[in-house]
Amino acid sequence: MAPKKKVTGLIKLQIQAGQANPAPPVGPALGAHGVNIMEFCKAYNAATENQRGNVVPVEITVYEDRSFDFKLKTPPAAKLLLKAAGLQKGSGVPHTQKVGSVTMDQVKEIAQTKMEDLNANDIENAARIIAGTARSMGIEVK
């Protein structure tokens, strides 16, 4: 087995799927670690091509020899909830002013999508986490 490469940095970014480019925020974050920015952009865009329109968080591990690998996460729950409710943004005063609503089935569907990134053992608990996010955004769960 090859010796493990030494990790020099971990970068977390949220980028539109298929739209990574060397402009900020991507360029400066990667440039600071000496990563080949265009190489990352091409790899990320190819990996997220089928998810266009979503924001896809990515965790980039940078190694001592300036090589890198990245792990894609699921889109943020807040973005998925806004899309399900058909809204542009959440409420400014979430507990007094509701801006939209989602059904429990939609919440479970989002929980299913987010399951691998959530700290939950089953779909019911995952749905509770997503419902809490919805409430904090001013979206009513019916």
From Swiss-Prot:
GO annotation terms (biological process): translation
Gene: rplK
Stored InterPro entries: Ribosomal_uL11, Ribosomal_uL11_bac-typ, Ribosomal_uL11_C, Ribosomal_uL11_C_sf, Ribosomal_uL11_N, Ribosomal_uL11_N_sf
Entry's family note: Belongs to the universal ribosomal protein uL11 family.
Keyword Glycoprotein recorded: no
Function field: Forms part of the ribosomal stalk which helps the ribosome interact with GTP-bound translation factors.
Keywords, alphabetical: Methylation, Ribonucleoprotein, Ribosomal protein, RNA-binding, rRNA-binding
PTM field: One or more lysine residues are methylated.
Assembly and interaction partners: Part of the ribosomal stalk of the 50S ribosomal subunit. Interacts with L10 and the large rRNA to form the base of the stalk. L10 forms an elongated spine to which L12 dimers bind in a sequential fashion forming a multimeric L10(L12)X complex.
Protein name: Large ribosomal subunit protein uL11
Organism of origin: Corynebacterium diphtheriae (strain ATCC 700971 / NCTC 13129 / Biotype gravis)
Gene3D superfamilies reported for this sequence: Ribosomal protein L11, C-terminal domain (1.10.10.250), Ribosomal protein L11/L12, N-terminal domain (3.30.1550.10)
GO terms assigned for molecular function: large ribosomal subunit rRNA binding; structural constituent of ribosome
GO cellular component: cytosolic large ribosomal subunit
